[in-house]
Amino acid sequence: MTLLFDKTGPIDSPTLAPASVDNHCRSPDRSAAARVIEIGLVNNMSDAALRATERQFMRLLRAGSGEHLVRLHCFALPSVQRSPATRQRIDSLYADIADLRHTRLDALIVTGAEPRAATLQSEPYWDEMRALVDWAEANTRSTIWSCLAAHAAVLHLDGIERERLPQKCSGVFAGEQVNDDALLSDLPSPLKVPHSRLNDLAADRLAARGYEVLTHAPNAGVDIFARQGRSRFVFFQGHPEYDATSLQREYLRDIGRFLTGERHDYPEFPVDYFDADIEDALDAFRAEAEAARDPAIIARLPHLALRQGTAEGIETTANALFRNWLISLASEP
């Protein structure tokens, strides 16, 4: 799936809308002369999140493209476990990851993946991820590494091991800028970034190996950090690309897994995410669910509502980040 779009046109793709003749959206009066920013998306998210991840990054790239044309190429690591239906979809719509060797890209976005093993080195995609890090270093001007992909990249590059958290970091956290960087230009203060992870990278260990921490959240730790080598690598421990209800969907998924016995512990609700009254109702539902572990009681889950300003804060932060990233790509030769 290769898409060409700019801020003025809708994204036209097999994922989002009925496809037009060539699945491209372009501005005819500008595209012939304008330089196109070529970006690859290596989408390794779970089957359930695959399409949402496509939409989220497409939306942010379109919103941030301004006067620039952006062409997005979609890839996926073949060793990520897939259902037959999802594998067929990837095979029909995505480019083969081997095609990266023959594709000129300005930048890359690499998503995380659902953990399957206790360590990154034991994941089935570990060798492919290592090779991707090396390729991106040699062949892109900038690459974004998101969540688990960020952890994998720093482990391969500098041997920095992530640390298991005592409980999952899930919520929308208020981050603050701790270093000046063009990537952070005109970002709101505080930043609002969703996090959803079981592991963490310590700021002091990153700094000791030459990484620059750009933003930090008191209750979530390092948020965005960067490394300048042959390519400028930008790392997200969180998920700025998430839409407003992504954490809600994950929370409901985990409740369902608890009720069916797929997980032994009841999930905590995301921090600073749901309305305070809803949190009280969710605590009451949890007590009921733990007392009577029955999938049927999901019908009694209270109606969910987000805290005021949450959706707007997430969107404003993410739009500014990706706008600044695209500006940096457009300004370089």
UniProtKB/Swiss-Prot annotation:
Its EC number is 2.3.1.46. One of its GO terms (molecular function) is homoserine O-acetyltransferase activity. The keyword Protein transport does not apply. The keyword Disulfide bond does not apply. The record marks 114, 148 as: Important for acyl-CoA specificity. One of its GO terms (biological process) is methionine biosynthetic process. Substrate binds at residues 168, 196, 253. It is found in: Cytoplasm. Pfam families: HTS (PF04204). The active site is at 147 (acyl-thioester intermediate), 239 (proton acceptor), 241. Its main location: cytoplasm. Pathway: Amino-acid biosynthesis; L-methionine biosynthesis via de novo pathway; O-succinyl-L-homoserine from L-homoserine: step 1/1. The record marks 196 as: Important for substrate specificity. Keywords: Acyltransferase, Amino-acid biosynthesis, Cytoplasm, Methionine biosynthesis, Transferase. GO terms for cellular component: cytoplasm. It catalyses: L-homoserine + succinyl-CoA = O-succinyl-L-homoserine + CoA. HAMAP family: MetA_acyltransf (MF_00295). Transfers a succinyl group from succinyl-CoA to L-homoserine, forming succinyl-L-homoserine. Belongs to the MetA family. This is Homoserine O-succinyltransferase. The gene is metAS.
